[in-house]
UniProtKB/Swiss-Prot annotation:
SUPFAM superfamilies: PurM C-terminal domain-like, PurM N-terminal domain-like
Tree of life domain: Archaea
Disulfide cross-links: none
Residues the entry annotates as binding substrate: 49, 251, 299
NCBIfam families in the record: PRK05731.2-2, thiL
A single MF term (Gene Ontology): magnesium ion binding
Name this protein carries in UniProt: Thiamine-monophosphate kinase
Role, per record: Catalyzes the ATP-dependent phosphorylation of thiamine-monophosphate (TMP) to form thiamine-pyrophosphate (TPP), the active form of vitamin B1.
Sites where the protein binds Mg(2+) 4: 26, 40, 70
Chain residues that bind Mg(2+) 5: 205
Amino acid sequence: MVVSMREGEIISLFMKHFERHSLGDDAGFIKLNNSWLLVTSDMLVWKTDVPDFMTPEDAGRKVVTMNVSDIAAMGGRPMAFFFSLAVPGDVSEDILRGIARGINEGSKVYKLKIVSGDTNEADDIIIDGGSLGIGKRLLLRSNAKPGDLVCVTGDLGRPLTALLLWMRGEKIPREIEEKARNPRARVEEGVKLSSLANSAIDISDGLSKELWEIANASNVRIIIEEERLPISDSVKEIVSDPVKVALASGEEFELLFTIPREKVEELDIDFKIIGRVEGGNGVYIKRGRKIEELEVLGWEHLAGGIDVEL
């Protein structure tokens, strides 16, 4: 019997069958003396993850960044990258060379050693990447505390804006396209956060979804303020509802984190305070004087992709 299931439901189904695991965060973890070995994997599928404004080199870099970002969100420093590649039998050599160059470039940016690989045949190009890292103190989604401030690195909205413009066949401004084609994982920020923050997650599926992930995992209530969202100026100039785009934009690879109020001044990174953590449940957004429950927006595999328009 075939049943339509969403990505989160499939993950939950598998976790119910695993008796020993450290799943449920951006990366798995194993204790090694005074440190933690961090392990993650993340897959790129050409049809859904590589719009044609991206090059094969972009795709290769992206699969490295996707995996490194998971290590960064746990407060770790990535050390190695590995991947499996499945391709159709008629794939062009130019595409393969481009992917290889991109993976190499990404590994150099993050100072990674490429340690393993495998190839197979499939109907689409699939790059299943993975990364290993080391962390001293783990940042978990499940450790947000009432009284924490909710913060985010960088700016939001550009990757989704690029995708929406592309879907409409419109020209993508260079500043918008730049982050969609070549995002950077916040490795140094994650390492600095590891000694100060209580919880963290990377923004791969959209700010809204990641806020709900932290709130549910930590059993807390999160309230963010609309006017505090760090929305890119270039996004504000293009889209009709920049707040909705910022909340839904995935593949940002920024870090969303919660931190005790008294430790904020110790942070030497670029970030914005967007809200607070309270006792209770759920995620809410303050719009002027009104507070309402935050809609879950963002990318959803197996459910039609994105649910936002320009």
